[in-house]
Each structure stands twice: as C-alpha cells, then as structure tokens.
C-alpha cells in the first residue's frame, strides 16, 4: 500500500539531501576547519562557507515552494503532528522496547506519537536554523549577528541528533522498523504487514477506502 505519493517523496528527498549537506559543511566549520576544504567543498570546487550559504538558500526556497504548492499536505502534516491522544503516553512508554520487538502500542493517527514529537521539534529546529542562517548572511557583524550565530550553533546541536535518530529509524535497521524505508523509496509502497505494525489505524482506513478490484 502506498504511504507517500511521488510528490511527497521527491520533496522529502530534496529536503534531506540539502539538510545533510548543510550539516556536513556546518559541522566542518564548527570544528574550526574553515581554512581547509571539506570533501564536499573539494567535490564542488567551492569553499565550505560558500557551499553552506548556497545550499541554505536552496533549502529556504525549497521549503517556500513546498508550502505554496502543497498547502493541503502541509495542513495535514501540521494538524496530525499537533494532535495529542490519551493513549500517546502509553505508546511512548513502550517504544524503547518496541523498536526491537516490533510490538508497538496501538495508535490511531497518521503519524505515531514519536513521529509527531519529532515532527514538531525538528520543524521548529530547522526553521530556527534557516531563519538565523539567513540573518547571518544578510548581516555583517554586530551584536545581533553574534546572537544569531550563537542560536544557529545551538540549534545545530539540537537538530543533529534528531536527524541522526530519524535516519536510523527510517533506514529500517532496527528490528521493529524493518521494511519502513519503503514508505519513502522505491515507489513509496509498504508491505501491508509493516503498515499494520507501525500505523494500524491508517492501514485499516487505507484498506477500507481502497476501491474493489
């Protein structure tokens, strides 16, 4: 069954590729290697600062296009991510064991409670990174620049482990999430068993709404 349509998958791929480049070049610069080209800078033949700035602009434009052209999807994403249900605490309490056993507590959302928390924190974190990054590009020194630089760094410290965790889960390496990577790759089609394990109510709705053969 199809979890994500083609447009969603391509948007997701474009976002994570730009974010990964930004994280790689950003951490290279944070580590004090501004005078030494990173492998990415060498590949593209440009300084890390220039590459970081250019890809940052690309991410900002990409998000703007996504919001404008995908208003319905954005609305669904926001509504589903901000929805809290009484059983969410129980789901979260069972999650650490479930990632190895696959025995997740039941939930009735489009996203599971862990995804919803991650969505909110990651979107806020990326928004802070993009906003402060644009400010750093437009300003040249001064107290505001110093504050933006500090916030940009701290947002990087927060967002990096979240993205690393997301990649770990989405890769399907953990037993409980085996097969989940197909939701965003190779046509976005999930094995029905995987869908029922991770998003039981969504899978049930999909089966109910599917037209008969």
Question: Which residue stretches match the model-derived regions?
Answer:
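Membrane-embedded alpha-helical bundles that constitute the cytochrome b-like, heme-associated redox core
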Residues: 1-213
């Amino acid at each position: 069954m199809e979890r994500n349509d083609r447009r969603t998958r391509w948007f997701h791929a474009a976002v994570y590729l730009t974010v990964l480049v930004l994280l790689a070049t950003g951490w290279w610069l944070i580590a004090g290697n501004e005078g030494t080209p990173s492998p990415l800078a060498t590949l593209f033949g440009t300084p890390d600062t220039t590459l970081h700035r250019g890809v940052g602009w690309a991410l900002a434009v990409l998000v703007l296009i996504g919001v404008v052209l995908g208003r319905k999807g954005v609305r669904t994403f926001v509504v589903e991510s901000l929805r809290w249900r009484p059983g969410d605490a129980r789901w979260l309490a069972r999650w650490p064991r479930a990632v190895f056993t696959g025995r997740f507590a039941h939930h009735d959302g489009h996203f599971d409670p862990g995804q919803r928390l991650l969505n909110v924190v990651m979107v806020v974190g990326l928004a802070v990174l993009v906003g402060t990054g644009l400010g750093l590009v437009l300003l040249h020194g001064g107290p505001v620049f110093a504050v933006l630089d500090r916030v940009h760094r701290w947002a990087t410290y927060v967002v990096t482990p979240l993205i690393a965790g997301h990649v770990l889960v989405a890769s399907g390496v953990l037993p409980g999430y085996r097969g989940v990577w197909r939701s965003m790759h190779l046509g976005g089609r999930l094995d029905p068993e995987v869908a029922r394990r991770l998003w039981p109510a969504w899978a049930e709705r999909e089966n109910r709404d599917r037209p008969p053969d």
